[in-house]
Structure formats: C-alpha cells, structure tokens
Amino acid sequence: MAIMRKTHPLLKIINHSFIDLPTPCNISSWWNFGSLLGICLIIQILTGLFLAMHYTSDTATAFSSVTHICRDVNYGWLIRYLHANGASMFFICLFIHVGRGIYYGSYMLSETWNIGIVLLLTTMATAFVGYVLPWGQMSFWGATVITNLLSAIPYIGTTLVEWIWGGFSVDKATLTRFFAFHFILPFIITAFVLVHLLFLHETGSGNPSGLNSDSDKIPFHPYYTIKDLLGVILLLMVLMILVLFFPDVLGDPDNYTPANPLNTPAHIKPEWYFLFAYAILRSXPNKLGGVLALILSILVLATFPLLNSSKQHGLVYRPITQALYWIFIANLLILTWIGGQPVEYPFTTVGQVASXLYFAIIVILMPIANMIENDILKL
C-alpha cells in the first residue's frame, strides 16, 4: 500500500517541501534563517490578528486603543510587544538571510533571488505602514516625512502625495488606509513566500562549499526538521527575553506621546531596521536624488547575479571579495548608526562617504575583485 503523504494531493505538496525534500548534507546554521522567517511571519500574522480585534483606526481613538490593549485586554501587553519586537526579529533574520545569500552566492538562483527582493520590499512597506498605526509622535511625523518624499517625483508628485494621504495632510483617511494596507500585505507576503519556495525547490538549495551537491543529498526530515526546531527555540528565547525584560529597548520614547501635528519631535527617525536606508536617503542633498538613492539601496541587490563574473560559487575561496564583503557589512552598521544621529557635522560627511561606499562595493569593487580572482586562478 502506498504511503498517504506521497499520494494525497495536499499532503504530497507538504511532503515534497518539508519531508522528502532532497537537501545538501552539509548546509550550515546560516541556512536556518529561511525557516525562522516563516516562523516570524506566522507570529506576526497571529499577534496582528488579535491586535486588530481591539484596535481602532481612527485618529481620535487609535492611541487610546493601543493603551487599552496594553492595560485592559488579557495579555494584551504581551501580544502588543510580541508584535512590535517580532518585527525586529523578522528584520534581523531577513538581513542575515540576505547576507548569507550574498556570501554563499545564492543570488545565482536568480528567480528565487528576485522574488526575495520583492519580499524584502513588501516587508519593508508593511513595517512602515504598521509603525504609523499606534498614532504616536514618531508614527505621525515618520508617516509625514516619508510619504512627503513622493512629492519629489516630477509633474505628478504633489498629486500623488495628496492621493496617498486622502487629503492635504496625514490625517484620519491616511490612518484608515494604512491599517487596511497593514492588514492585507502580510497575506500577500505569504503568497510571495510560496512562490519563493516554489522557485527554490526547482533548483534545490546551495551549500557552503559552493560545489554541486546533487550526488550527496539527504531527506529534509528528520535531520533538518530537528535542526530548524533548535533555531526556532533559540529565536523564541531571544524574542521572549526582549519582550519580557526589554520591551521598549528598540522603540522610540516619542511614540508614547500622542500624535500632535503642531509639535515636531527634535529628531525624526524610523525604526532601527530602516536606519541604513534613511542614512542613504539623507546623504543626497537633492530631494529627488535622495529618493532615488533610497529605492536603489534595495534594488541594487538585483545587480548581484548580473555583475557576477566569478568562476566560483560563493566567497569561501575568494579572499579579495570576502574582505570586501566584511567591509560592506561594517559599512552597513555605520550607516545604521548614522541614520539615528542628528543632521550635523561630522555625521553628514560620514553618512555621505558610507553611502557612496555602499554602492561602490556592490557595483564597482566586487566585479573588479571577481576579475582579479579569475586571473589568479589561471596562474
């Protein structure tokens, strides 16, 4: 008799994705972050659903409804902080996942990589509209500043901004539509995740050696299910330490002040996971230039498969590109720090140098290093 999981139409899909999936036997813990992102997405959707049951998307009551969730709803404080800090964990896993993809040459699976970039952009959009919902000072002014950037688009800019706002400023209509977007986008992300997995399972995973692993594969279950479970336990442990001991460490104190259009906070800045992009945005002295730099800071990831000329897969045996990679990571951390600093000397200058280096490493230095390493191989 045939095994049900191999014949049943629904179970067959799960079986081919999580049980009998042929997996390289040498993939390291850096490959755990895909499953951790799946767990983060599930946590965010579940906590978000319970928050939406008590939240009101109206400027008069939004701030009070969040306070009500924390004070009066059973375990409301836990759900709220799980959702807020879950977003931070989501982005930590995302950045590591992308970093792993760059280091081990996963971008050569171009369909999977491109869907991944779409996923990154959609997740960033979701987090941005979500940050507006508590209707604190930073929510309001963050929404005002970032949506206002669209006015830099020639000819249609001003009309576009007013259309997104639903009026002449960030107000009731803006909050309502942002709530609608924040509710629907995670389900769109889930659909993209399935496409991401579909493309990945067409080619199979890469592995740390960068060599073809077709001759040496093992089933995903039980080895990798247990390995992923360990990752999940560690992720939940870090998340719970954040939520129960340091719930506000990654937030902004200004967001505990209700939104006031007449009073601007001293330093308007987004959540920590957007600071690198915010620093790049602020580095260009021209408004439109800044907006383009902001968009390109993510879209530049799409150039990796195009600019790669290396004979080797991944950076394991490529010392020059490896050095550039770690300089790139350090530079990203500098940009994150600069994004949270006031706009004054020397921060502006450091930000401009770091922004230029961010693009230079990806578009100029890494392709040159590829060619040098190819020449060294011929010696």
From Swiss-Prot:
Cofactor(s) it depends on: heme b
Keywords per UniProt: Electron transport, Heme, Iron, Membrane, Metal-binding, Mitochondrion, Mitochondrion inner membrane, Respiratory chain, Transmembrane, Transmembrane helix, Transport, Ubiquinone
Main location: mitochondrion
Topology class, membrane: Multi-pass membrane protein
Binding site for a ubiquinone: H201
Cysteine-cysteine disulfides: none
GO MF annotations, alphabetized: metal ion binding; ubiquinol-cytochrome-c reductase activity
Gene3D superfamilies: Cytochrome Bc1 Complex, Chain C
Cofactor binding summary note: Binds 2 heme b groups non-covalently.
Function: Component of the ubiquinol-cytochrome c reductase complex (complex III or cytochrome b-c1 complex) that is part of the mitochondrial respiratory chain. The b-c1 complex mediates electron transfer from ubiquinol to cytochrome c. Contributes to the generation of a proton gradient across the mitochondrial membrane that is then used for ATP synthesis.
Protein name: Cytochrome b
Organism: Abrothrix jelskii
